[in-house]
Amino acid sequence: MSDPASWISERSQCFDSSGIRKVFDLAAKLENPVNLSIGQPDFDVPDSVKQACVEAIQQGKNAYSPSQGIGSLRSELQARVDKRFEHEDREVFVSSGTSGGLVLTVLSLVNPGDEVIIFDPYFVMYVPLVQLVGGVPVLVDTYPDFRIDLDKVESVITDKTKLILFNSPGNPTGIAASKEEVQGLAQLAADKNIALLSDEIYSQFVYDDQAYTPADYNPNTIVIDGFSKSHAMTGWRVGWVHGPSEVIQTMIKLQQYSFVCAPQPAQWAGLAALDVEMTQYQADYRRKRDLLVEGLKDDFEFTEPGGAFYLFPKVPSGTGTEFVTKAIEKDLLIIPGSIFSSQDTHVRISYAAPDATIEKGVEILKGLARG
């Protein structure tokens, strides 16, 4: 009798399934949860974007597109990137979501044994992705305020360091890096000849300052962006990546043998999305941020987030996992911080939810904090 379990590759056994998915599975079993666990907007895709997709389907634009993306979308993105950065060697292509862009970037750059610097806490995908390609994740602790200490970064750089993974505004912390942090990191990467990948999927959700990108200070920065968060298109799988042409051409080559292309109808929708004004949605999320912060500031210790749609407070006692267990007993869904970190002291709370849900969540959280 054959044993299918013996067929599983070692690389796929070095990490577990996403803990976030486990929480989502649990949510499906609760009748009416107060759900502050979701990492996607609670508004819908704009109507004009939906209509552009429908029209593309009806017009028969349903086949493969070029791997680098449909010409009109790629040209528009390239024009915007050129105007913004004025780099001679910055090229753009359309990826199958920002996650697809992350996969292709790491596949293009990281050899087995290469070290990749990741700031802790981190987006849940980063560490497993580096492990999947045989790289070595090197975590840089940013607790308690989740700011980048360049001395810490420099202290872990070795002759094996290949890549720095940077995310601002960050998931799970919501922290938007300052100009000084971004500029310093960009310069350090340039001085050390280390690739720098900037995950900017939340760049449209910055509330108190502006979104700073290391590409302004290091022309070899690779930038990942997309429509998933800004236009609530998480299920449409359209992102884009821009960076040095040699890297981008390698990623396009790998896309030909993996994702092939982003879904063509969704690319036409993405083209329409570029012309949709989204500032009201962003203002609404700033208000939701303030609602959550005001509700929890007397009972929890946290650094106020400047972007994205997450709060990452320290739990009053015990571990983050224990606190989440107690929250679930009250029908509240939040995410334990250990999913995003080597530490189990915090929880991630999403305010991408209706105001009434946020208010219910605040009351439950305050009750748990006060015992």
What do these predicted ranges mean?
Residues 60, 83-86:
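Glycine-centered secondary-structure boundary/capping sites
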Residues 75-81:
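Short, well-ordered amphipathic alpha-helices
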Residues 34-42, 55-75:
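A glycine-/small-polar-enriched, mobile loop at the entrance of the PLP active site in fold-type I
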Residues 1-10, 14-15, 26-30, 34, ...:
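PLP-dependent class I/II
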